[in-house]
Amino acid sequence: IKSFQSSNILNNNYIIRTVSSKVDLDRFYGKTNTEDVINELIELSQPDPETKTIFLWPEGIIPNINQTEFKEFEFLFNNNFNKNHLLAIGINSYEKNNGKDYFYNTFSVYDHKLDLLHDYKKVKLVPFGEFLPFEKILKRIGLKSLTNNYQSFSSGKSREILSIDIEGFDLEVLPLICYEIIYSGNIFKNSEFDVIINVSEDGWFGDSIGPHQHFAHSVFRSIESGKYLLRSANNGVSAIINPTGKIENKIEFS
């Protein structure tokens, strides 16, 4: 696992530190210890108690837990994180409504005690990867989606800009999860945001050109919006891209 932080200083002296990781997809099948992954990510995040920092971790990087269950691992953060630190991460969430279970691919922002501050539920889902079309019928013949033992994900209601507002610090974030980054034009209906954040799990591409093609779309979204774009990927390319499309910092996967 490697990490880097942006050279971009945000208002009220916050920085964003992006963590780029290479955790095997075996974690989705019970072969990875959750605490070990969290501890490694904390170590690579290198939190400085005096530096106000938003740590950006990839999509689905922590195995076998959901957004609410993450709180149970607060003890791992106690010696490293303090009130100067926020964590933004892609992690699944769960709701129960009228007796029915709903699962979402979610971008979540936590404080240093792992109390949830904000979240965005992914709107554009990947067919067969995140949901199974005609699920009731196709499950009967053995087909299923690749959603880490969940049923199909549900789609969020709408694309939302998250307002991270804490102790005088205000940042308007447009979160895009995984392949939502490939959509041109219609993701910017509301342009009142400061930065785009894209979290992704690119391991599904395997040993192919896929992760590089996926990353290339990030450059175009940055140019289209005229905003900085910060990308944190597992098994993919993580980067900071400025509003002109220049890549200011990048970590290649290998």
Q: Predicted segment positions?
A:
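Enzyme catalytic cores with a strong preference for nitrogen-chemistry domains
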Residues: 1-254
